[in-house]
């Protein structure tokens, strides 16, 4: 009789503990990321359309073709080229190794101007540069191609970064120079050091010109982050890398300036300036492109004809990857959209959490 009376009590106690566990201990299921295809277009001799007012325009460069497309999947410009080309969302130019006085055009194929020099044009958004023959000098141009100022050096330029107000260049001897875009004056000249064989393999400068991040050296290669104090750069963070990268690599400040990403052999590092935290994420292949939006950082890495897109959340965690085979590829972002170019196609995916 006593046993029968105790059974309901056991059931009640078990139910209470189960309910308390559900309330206090159970964690909600993680949200899954959904990739929704919006459209896919061919860039093989496409029909050319006009962009509507306010329609977002982006560039593509796949193999020996380049051009512009819109967020709604319209190709508005398509060019093939036998030799060399430079392109940004604002300008493009087709040229060869002997080119002089190089014409360049807007994203609507309208003549923009002529770069009054011989060399290799380089566009970053609406900024225009030309690297001069020899690889140790460059010029900054205005919107018509006229030379504004020129840096003439004797050491090979091994890394380069440009923002609206400042330009930074890294050199084979391990030095970094920062130039004022308005005047061309050299404001900073320093060497991160710390390695047996100094060379700057990758760098980026923050939009306000206050921070410079770089990967430098061989034999004890390291990543450094420096901050401008008056007319000097002070290293505020550094870490030695566990492997040496034998090639030029990417360093990238995020748009909000709070994080900087750097790629080296076998990994990507993410340094959070606000949290003073350095996170390492294994990425086996060389990263060739970094794009971002408000929620994610997308990285495109390459090993021969195998491309991998890695998605990093703003908590510096790798949320997922996917791979594909191609001879050439690119990625681009706009809001929640991810654009993937592959050989002769471009796809738009909407990325969301469910």
How would you label these PLM feature ranges?
Residues 63-68, 99-105, 135-139, 174-179, ...:
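Structural motif
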Residues 43-53, 78-91, 114-127, 152-164, ...:
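Repeated scaffold domains used in trafficking and secretory/extracellular systems
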Residues 326-354:
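Blade-level signature of beta-propeller repeat domains, shared across WD40, Kelch, NHL, RCC1
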Residues 90-200:
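Non-cytosolic head/periplasmic domains of membrane-anchored proteins
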């Amino acid at each position: 009789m006593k046993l029968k009376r105790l059974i309901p009590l056991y059931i009640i106690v078990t139910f209470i503990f189960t309910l308390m566990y559900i309330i206090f201990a159970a964690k909600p299921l993680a949200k899954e990321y959904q990739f929704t295809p919006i459209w896919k277009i061919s860039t093989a001799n496409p029909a050319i359309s006009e962009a509507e007012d306010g329609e977002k325009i982006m560039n593509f460069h796949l193999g020996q073709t380049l051009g512009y497309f819109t967020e709604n999947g319209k190709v508005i410009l398509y060019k093939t080229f036998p030799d060399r080309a430079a392109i940004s969302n604002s300008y493009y130019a087709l040229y060869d190794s002997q080119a002089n006085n190089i014409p360049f055009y807007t994203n609507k194929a309208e003549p923009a101007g002529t770069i009054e020099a011989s060399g290799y044009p380089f566009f970053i958004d609406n900024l225009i540069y030309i690297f001069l023959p020899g690889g140790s000098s460059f010029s900054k141009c205005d919107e018509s191609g006229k030379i504004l100022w020129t840096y003439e050096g004797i050491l090979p330029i091994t890394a380069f970064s440009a923002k609206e107000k400042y330009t930074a260049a890294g050199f084979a001897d391990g030095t970094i120079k920062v130039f004022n875009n308005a005047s061309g004056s050299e404001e900073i000249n320093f060497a991160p050091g710390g390695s047996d064989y100094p060379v700057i393999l990758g760098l980026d400068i923050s939009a306000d010109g206050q921070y410079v991040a770089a990967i430098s050296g061989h034999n004890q290669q390291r990543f450094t982050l420096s901050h401008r104090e008056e007319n000097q750069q002070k290293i505020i963070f550094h870490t030695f890398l566990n492997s040496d990268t034998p090639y030029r690599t990417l360093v990238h400040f995020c748009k909000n300036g709070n994080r900087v990403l750097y790629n080296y052999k076998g990994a990507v590092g993410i340094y959070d300036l606000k949290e003073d935290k350095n996170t390492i994420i294994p990425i086996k292949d060389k990263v060739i492109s970094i794009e971002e939006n408000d929620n994610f950082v997308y990285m495109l890495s390459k090993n021969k004809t195998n491309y991998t897109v890695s998605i990093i959340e703003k908590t510096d965690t790798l949320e997922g990857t996917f791979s594909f085979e191609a001879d050439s590829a690119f990625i681009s972002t706009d809001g929640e959209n991810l654009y993937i170019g592959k050989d002769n196609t471009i796809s738009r995916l909407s990325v969301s959490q469910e």
